[in-house]
Structure formats: C-alpha cells, structure tokens
C-alpha cells in the first residue's frame, strides 16, 4: 500500500540559514546587532556621563555597515539558500566583511580601526547565526508535535 504524500513527515530543518528576505528575520538581525552594540558600549564605559556620547559614536560606526549587510543579505537571499549550510555561513561572514570594508572609507577609519570593525562584525555575525540556529533548534520539536496533532485530528473522526 502506497503512502500518501501528505502523510509523509516533512524533513525537519537542520542547521542552515534563515530566510533573509523575511521581515521578521531582518528585524531580529537588526535587534541582535544593536543589542550587541549597546552591550559593547555598556561594558566599555568608564563614566556614566559619557555613556550617551559613546552610544552615539557606536551607533555611527555600526548602523551603516549593518544596514548595508542587511541589504546585501536580502539581495543575495536566494543564492544563499541554495548553498550548503557551512558555505552559506561563510558567505554571511563575507557579506559582513564586505559591508564593513565598503563603509570604512566613509568613516575615515585607519587600519587598526578597520581590523577592530572587521573583528566586531565577525563576532556579531557569529552571535546572530548562533541565535538563529538556537531558535531553529527550539522550534523543531514544536513543529513535529504540531504535525502529529494535525494527523491525529484528521484520523480521530474515523474511529469515534
């Protein structure tokens, strides 16, 4: 007896990239990176009076590369989805690096500042990708349970 296509369980999502064309994903990327910038400023602050000024400086350094990276990830979204998981993650790091390098002439950064910005962007990209992997891992059991409940609801009328 052949199985119905609808009854075959869908392959659960493994480690991979989120859909960078989704507005929710874009919002989460912006929030995670901005929270990391806020945390960086809070950890580095010596004086509470300079916290607002340091936060404004950090926002000036972070926002342009961040928006550029989100735009590039949006444009490259379909190509990134076709890549293997590790290659896609490497491409995200490359996009983050490219965004920093493109925006660095506008900020007038010297070589050490550029290296710090690249390192910070790699750290932010790694934490953001880890967040999406963790989120995917947490939702996987819920999806399997929802599929089982839907199947049970379809079968129940035949037996009661």
Pin down the residues of each PLM region.
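Hydrophobic alpha-helices of bacterial signal-transduction systems
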Residues: 1-140
